């Protein structure tokens, strides 16, 4: 039966934020309406064309490919044209025209084509003139029928009988206005009419939800005037509705069917299309065999030398390695993958030649001897027991996939090399599509419908978060009762009218969820084709980039025949590169190519859990695992990297116990001991599963890979089939059926979360390399880490703490020493010594008499110097001396790590110092730097960070004088530029521009630093309280790891709140706090609403608090949960202290008495009593005891001062 009507104007969500239909929905609507074909014509792109074609064919429908493009028909005037592919030539021209809209140079007003483009690529295309949005329609709306006729003839001349007049009836006045003229022109020029309907949503009831979608696109609310809207009739009208609507124009309906019959092409899958690496002299197959054999000989020569392998053993090893090489080469060449290996090898060899650090391997590719020989990987697969079949299985043909890690800073250079070698038109990135997921769509819809923010925020926080598998809104409603109730209109708050609006928000969000919102590019994927990309796929180009982007997602790019290469930027490789560069400047060369993984210092450091900065080993739980494991070989590091994941983590205690001979390994069967001995009986790796199947049940390694995959997927039918094969093979190997089934069950359990050993080994090597650098060259390594995290103040704090713990000196920001980035110096000028800010504790209200200032200059009251000072060592002594000369290793704080200061400004400062010497004063600094380089915020943060302490010891005075300093700068530079003579030079006024000011107290200085750098570098607000904390049983964070048993404990900690983060979960609101004390930064959670309510006044950033909390310490690390809070002042004031003081002479006695006298002026409040013990200078062993009758009200710093007189 001949169809009655075909929709030719259906748009999907690839018309971003314009259509509320997915590809699947478009096809399902056509199928349910008994249409044998459907045309997808998205606005401006063909991103969904292959997905559409494959899905339509799967459902038994004919896909018709179309696209709606802008065409320029006058100066800066555009209209729409709908182009449809008639055949393969037409589809290729459709690809070219749609891609041209993104790659033309004149995209300023909109993406478009010109008439010249249409003339060049018209072959195989059918065109519809888009009614009111088209050229003819726009001319008629402008009452220019003559112009309409002119352009109609022009399009007819270009396309002939492949040009149609599209007519629509959405009940819009503009359509009705032009219809008669439109039909008359069509008749006069004999251009066929074709009836269409804009299909943007499935049914009329979806109009309101679609209207919200348009508001999201425009960034406006529904109440916004003059916003874009569409007719409620832009839904998927049935054939019956369309026939009835155009009953007066039956030919327009019939022409939809006729047009469909002219189209006979559908996009389809293609075989892989790679550039041909062969030359006229040698084929790809011969070339890979030649390069691989030469490469293996070079690898073995290096191996024999670095591992001191005796000459008599070398021939045997050569035989083993070449046998494996030839086996792999045969498989690679038979699968026609030689070109792929050669392409990867080429750009990696180029990278290494250019000094760009490449990772030793990533993923299963590290298991290939061919890859090792071609320098693709740097891991000896046979030495590490890696399997080629895990990478390329001869029994399951699929494309190989090398993921390559490059130094992040130089990754673009490699991509540019590939572009230059194969051509810019043949290399491209891969597009990705951002979807409207549950949380985001609720926020978008709530904003459009003007739902108050607090309700929208509450709703979104109720949706559970999962980075790996985002939770759908429908799923969240099933799992979260509050969300389900809201969707039923029960409401979240007792506010009239809000329940109904909340229900509308959720109902609309359910309709729009999953639609495409925008496009971006894949983080690492690059495709390389053997022909221009636009011959195969649509291409896209971002206006800010000159690199092509494939318009299909990764999945459909591969189906189209494009091969993806992952060029990944790994920050750790940048750290290694930068560290080696710093060492090279000192004449130290580190060669990782010949590393033997046996450095004692490295393992000593790891055994102590010193994992900060070490690749894979930075988390608290991993550091704890290192302490318990006490690794002494690269195999331990590889195993731990594979085990430290949900699931396998439960086997860490077994691995550790067996390693330290506290438990006997279970090898399952004596035949399996050679396979499991390395991991103490624990099945960790997928390769072990393959070996077990091979040894025990006679599987080939290829078949064993299929078994591994089946076990990983846990598909019941496949598992049953594999178990039968496994048991039969084991029985043939003289193993009982019951034991075979038992082993199969055990292996299946492990295989479910088994890890790829090739990947674990490659990343284990990177872990070892970073650990080696840190253990042997800690200052240079930490500087490299710091410079990579220049804008992450939490990480900077962490790395500086690690430097302190390692006994490395750190110099605080100094305008005469610091550079744009962190640096390492071996000799520091004397001026760089960390020094006090004049009298650090400025007299307080009702404060100290003049004589007491001598007490305040006690050593305990000097600048805390947690990090800085030429003579400051780490506070912990758990690191053995590694032989590293720490006296020659001082880290200089970076100017670029100060807020509002860039590394470029730091370079400006450094260059000026090199050219004209150190800065002599604040005004000298301002005079010598360009006027435009300094602004108020920059100067403020430089002052607060202490950069100018060497030039001027009163930060508060400089801070108070910022406006005067900037005014002076402007006047000085204006005078310099004018070059005019003046009796009074501006520079002569410089000594008088600073406003008189007292010195800031310790706390003010500490928070100056926190505000400017996000951390406390030379002062910490809690340093002055350390003595009193010990009296109050308030622990230091260092005690948490060292002195507490495993399990749950209740402790008191003190800290300064540095960050506060409020979140929602299905169980309610919780808050995460980041705090610091003089030793560490730590994090704790508050789950109790009651705690949040009772102590909300104490939980502001910068608050000094004492927290009573539960601490859970286990193999996963330490977790802190707050139970109550108090301010530092309350904690001190609510306790009565008894002091015993022992002055050694009259001067000390006078200082004590003066200080205590200053603390007796508040008799209504006291927290201390004092007893003084005096020793007579003339009578041996005579001590006078004086109990003072007064009670005193002491503060934190007082206890620190008086500590010097206690025993």
From Swiss-Prot:
PANTHER family per UniProt: DNA POLYMERASE III SUBUNIT ALPHA
Subunit structure of this chain's protein: DNA polymerase III contains a core (composed of alpha, epsilon and theta chains) that associates with a tau subunit. This core dimerizes to form the PolIII' complex. PolIII' associates with the gamma complex (composed of gamma, delta, delta', psi and chi chains) and with the beta chain to form the complete DNA polymerase III complex.
Stated name of the protein: DNA polymerase III subunit alpha
Pfam families membership: DNA_pol3_alpha, DNA_pol3_finger, HHH_6, PHP
Superkingdom per UniProt: Bacteria
EC number: 2.7.7.7
Family: Belongs to the DNA polymerase type-C family. DnaE subfamily.
Keywords carried by this UniProt record: Cytoplasm, DNA replication, DNA-directed DNA polymerase, Nucleotidyltransferase, Transferase
Reaction catalysed by this enzyme: DNA(n) + a 2'-deoxyribonucleoside 5'-triphosphate = DNA(n+1) + diphosphate
The keyword Cytoplasm is assigned to this record: yes
């Amino acid at each position: 039966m001949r169809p009655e009507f075909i929709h030719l104007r259906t748009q999907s969500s690839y018309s971003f934020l314009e259509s509320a239909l997915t590809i699947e929905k478009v096809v399902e609507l056509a199928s349910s309406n008994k249409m044998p074909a459907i045309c997808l014509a998205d606005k401006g792109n063909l991103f969904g064309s292959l997905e559409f074609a494959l899905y339509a064919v799967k459902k038994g429908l004919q896909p018709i490919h179309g696209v709606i493009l802008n065409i320029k028909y006058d100066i800066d005037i555009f209209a729409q044209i709908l182009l449809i592919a008639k055949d393969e030539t037409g589809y290729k021209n459709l690809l070219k025209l749609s891609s041209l809209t993104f790659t033309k140079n004149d995209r300023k007003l909109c993406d478009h084509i010109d008439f010249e483009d249409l003339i060049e690529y018209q072959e195989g295309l059918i065109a519809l003139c888009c009614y009111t949005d088209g050229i003819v329609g726009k001319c008629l709306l402008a009452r220019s029928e003559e112009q309409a006729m002119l352009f109609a003839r022009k399009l007819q001349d270009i396309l002939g009988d492949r040009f149609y007049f599209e007519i629509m009836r959405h009940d819009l006045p503009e359509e009705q206005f032009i219809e008669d003229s439109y039909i008359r022109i069509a008749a006069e020029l004999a251009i066929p009419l074709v009836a269409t309907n804009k299909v943007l949503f499935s049914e009329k009831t979806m109009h309101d939800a679609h209207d919200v979608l348009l508001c999201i696109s425009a960034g406006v609310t529904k109440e916004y005037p003059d916003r874009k809207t569409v007719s409620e009739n832009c839904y998927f009208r049935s054939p019956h509705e369309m026939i009835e609507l155009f009953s007066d124009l039956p030919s327009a309906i019939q022409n939809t069917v006729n047009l469909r019959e002219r189209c006979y092409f559908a996009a389809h899958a293609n075989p892989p299309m790679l550039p041909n690496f062969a030359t006229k002299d040698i084929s790809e197959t011969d070339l890979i065999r030649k390069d691989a054999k030469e490469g293996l000989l070079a690898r073995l020569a290096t191996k024999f030398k670095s591992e001191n392998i005796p000459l008599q053993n070398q021939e045997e090893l050569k035989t083993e390695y070449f046998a494996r090489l030839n086996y792999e080469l045969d498989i690679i060449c038979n699968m026609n993958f030689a070109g792929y290996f050669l392409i990867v090898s080429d750009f990696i060899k180029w990278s290494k030649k250019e000094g760009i650090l490449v990772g030793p391997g990533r993923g299963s590719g590290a298991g290939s001897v061919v890859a090792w020989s071609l320098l693709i990987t740097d891991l000896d697969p046979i030495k590490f027991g890696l399997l080629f079949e895990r990478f390329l299985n001869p029994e399951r043909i699929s494309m190989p996939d090398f993921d390559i890690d490059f130094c992040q800073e130089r990754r673009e250079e490699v991509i540019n090399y590939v572009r230059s070698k194969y051509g810019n038109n043949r290399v491209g990135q891969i597009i990705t599509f951002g979807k409207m997921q549950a949380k985001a769509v609720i926020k978008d819809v709530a904003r459009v419908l003007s739902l108050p923010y607090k309700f929208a925020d509450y709703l979104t926080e109720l949706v559970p978060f999962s980075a790996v598998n985002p939770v759908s809104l429908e799923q969240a409603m099933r799992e979260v009762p509050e969300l389900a109730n809201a969707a039923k209109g029960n409401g979240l708050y007792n506010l009239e009218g809000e329940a109904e609006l909340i229900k509308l928000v959720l109902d609309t969000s359910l309709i729009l969820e999953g639609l495409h919102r925008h496009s971006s590019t894949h983080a690492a994927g690059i495709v390389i084709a053997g022909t221009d990309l636009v011959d195969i796929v649509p291409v896209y180009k971002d206006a800010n980039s000159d690199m092509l982007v494939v318009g299909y997602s990764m999945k459909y790019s591969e189906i189209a025949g494009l091969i993806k290469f992952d060029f990944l930027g790994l920050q750790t490789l940048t750290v290694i590169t930068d560290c080696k560069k710093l060492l090279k400047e000192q004449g130290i060369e580190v060669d990782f190519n010949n590393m033997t993984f046996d450095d004692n210092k490295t393992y000593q450091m790891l055994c102590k859990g010193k994992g900060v900065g070490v690749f894979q080993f930075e988390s608290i739980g991993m550091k704890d695992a290192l302490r318990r494991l006490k690794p002494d070989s690269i195999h331990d590091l590889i195993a731990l990297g594979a085990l430290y994941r949900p699931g396998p983590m439960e086997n860490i205690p077994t691995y550790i116990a067996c390693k330290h001979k506290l438990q006997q390994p279970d090898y399952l069967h004596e035949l399996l001991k050679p396979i499991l001995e390395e991991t103490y009986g624990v099945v960790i790796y997928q390769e072990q599963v393959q070996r077990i199947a091979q040894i025990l049940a006679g599987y080939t390694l290829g078949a064993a890979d299929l078994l591994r995959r089946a076990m990983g997927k846990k598909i019941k039918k496949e598992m049953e089939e594999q178990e039968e094969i496994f048991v039969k093979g084991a029985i043939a190997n003289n193993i009982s059926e019951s034991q075979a089934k038992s082993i199969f069950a055990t292996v299946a359990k492990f295989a479910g979360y088994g890890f790829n050993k090739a990947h674990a080994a490659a990343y284990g090597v990177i872990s070892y390399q970073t650990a080696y650098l840190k253990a042997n060259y800690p200052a240079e390594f930490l500087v490299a880490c710091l410079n990579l995290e220049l804008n992450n103040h939490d990480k900077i704090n962490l790395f500086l703490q690690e430097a302190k713990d390692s006994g490395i000196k750190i110099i605080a920001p100094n305008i005469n020493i610091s550079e744009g980035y962190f640096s390492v110096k071996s000799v520091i000028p004397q001026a760089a010594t960390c020094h006090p800010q004049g009298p650090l504790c400025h007299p307080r209200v009702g404060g100290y008499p003049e004589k007491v200032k001598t007490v305040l200059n006690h050593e305990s009251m000097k600048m805390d110097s947690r990090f800085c000072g030429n003579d400051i060592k780490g506070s912990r002594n758990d690191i053995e001396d590694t032989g590293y000369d720490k006296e020659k290793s001082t880290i200089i704080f970076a100017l670029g790590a100060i807020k509002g200061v860039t590394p470029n400004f730091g370079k400006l400062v450094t260059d000026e110092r090199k050219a004209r010497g150190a800065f002599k004063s604040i005004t000298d600094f301002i005079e010598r730097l360009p006027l435009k380089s300094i602004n108020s915020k920059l100067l403020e943060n430089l002052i607060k960070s202490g950069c100018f302490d060497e030039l001027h010891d009163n930060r508060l005075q400089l801070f108070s004088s910022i406006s005067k300093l900037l005014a002076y700068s402007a006047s000085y530079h204006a005078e310099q530029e004018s070059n005019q003579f003046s009796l009074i030079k501006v520079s002569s006024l410089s000594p008088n521009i600073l406003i008189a000011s007292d010195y800031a107290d310790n706390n003010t200085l500490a928070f100056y630093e926190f505000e400017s750098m996000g951390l406390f570098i030379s002062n910490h607000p809690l340093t002055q309280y350390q003595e009193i904390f010990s009296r109050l049983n308030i622990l230091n964070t260092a005690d948490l790891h060292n002195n507490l048993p495993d399990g749950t404990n209740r402790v008191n900690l003190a800290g300064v709140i540095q960050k506060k983060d409020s979140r929602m979960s299905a169980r309610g609101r919780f808050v995460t706090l980041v705090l610091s004390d003089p030793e560490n930064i730590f994090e704790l959670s508050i789950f109790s609403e009651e705690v949040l309510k009772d102590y909300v006044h104490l939980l502001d950033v910068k608050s000094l608090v004492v927290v009573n909390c539960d601490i859970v310490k286990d193999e996963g690390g330490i977790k802190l949960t707050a139970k109550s809070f108090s301010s530092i002042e309350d904690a001190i004031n609510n306790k009565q202290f008894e002091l015993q003081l022992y002055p050694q002479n009259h001067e000390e006695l006078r200082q004590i008495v003066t200080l205590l006298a200053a603390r007796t002026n508040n008799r209504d409040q006291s927290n201390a009593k004092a007893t003084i013990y005096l020793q007579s200078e003339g009578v041996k062993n005579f001590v006078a005891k004086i109990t003072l009758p007064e009670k005193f009200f002491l503060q934190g710093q007082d206890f620190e001062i008086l500590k010097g007189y206690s025993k």
